[in-house]
Amino acid sequence: MKKKTEILDAASIQRALTRMSHEILEKNKGGENLVLIGIKTRGVPLAKRIQQKIKQIESIEVPLGELDITMYRDDLDKVSEQEDPKINSVSIGMDITDKHVILIDDVLFTGRTVRAAMDAVMDVGRPSTIQLGSLVDRGHRELPIRADYVGKNIPTSDREIVVVQLSEQDQEDRVSLYEK
């Protein structure tokens, strides 16, 4: 893999998350009845950052959950035989019935991860709405899924890969574009 360019630096990521937080509050008329759910792995720290920004803006703490969608994926047959997929129960840690659930992920690509996340959420409860926030939307949908809140739209080719690095896991914040 060869690095082509850095798309977002740490300051750009923070600005994008601040804007997304304001958009979430504006669309939902405040933070009441909201639940943020980070899709593992990098959606979780992004959701935590949005939660903190909403707290700074509105002085309320929006409930935060984590979602592992491994068993909801429709591409498990493509996992190599040496890799056993982990079987994890869905536990968001709160009642989401009649709440506005905001799913947070790092990169929106084909839409398959989001579809799996929506299936998992619906197995746990019946939210009023499910909305989607993504730090990067790179296009190439295979399913009719669109993000409500996007940090940056980055049109890519099939031969490019978007890599999100976050300080919580990677020691630095950066979004880069690589060529396969």
Swiss-Prot record:
Record SUPFAM superfamilies: PRTase-like
InterPro entries assigned to the protein according to its UniProt record, in alphabetical order: PRibTrfase_dom, PRTase-like, PyrR, PyrR_bifunctional
EC number annotated for this UniProt entry: 2.4.2.9
MF terms (GO), sorted A to Z: RNA binding; uracil phosphoribosyltransferase activity
Keywords: Glycosyltransferase, RNA-binding, Transcription, Transcription regulation, Transcription termination, Transferase
Catalytic reaction(s) noted: UMP + diphosphate = 5-phospho-alpha-D-ribose 1-diphosphate + uracil
Motif PRPP-binding positions after renumbering to this chain: 101-113
Superkingdom to which the source organism belongs: Bacteria
UniProt key word Transferase: yes
Gene Ontology BP annotations: DNA-templated transcription termination
Membrane-traversing stretches: none
Family membership noted in the UniProt record: Belongs to the purine/pyrimidine phosphoribosyltransferase family. PyrR subfamily.
Family matches, as PANTHER family: BIFUNCTIONAL PROTEIN PYRR (PTHR11608:SF0)
Role noted for this protein: Regulates transcriptional attenuation of the pyrimidine nucleotide (pyr) operon by binding in a uridine-dependent manner to specific sites on pyr mRNA. This disrupts an antiterminator hairpin in the RNA and favors formation of a downstream transcription terminator, leading to a reduced expression of downstream genes.
Self-association and partners: Homodimer and homohexamer; in equilibrium.
Name this protein carries in UniProt: Bifunctional protein PyrR
Organism: Oceanobacillus iheyensis (strain DSM 14371 / CIP 107618 / JCM 11309 / KCTC 3954 / HTE831)
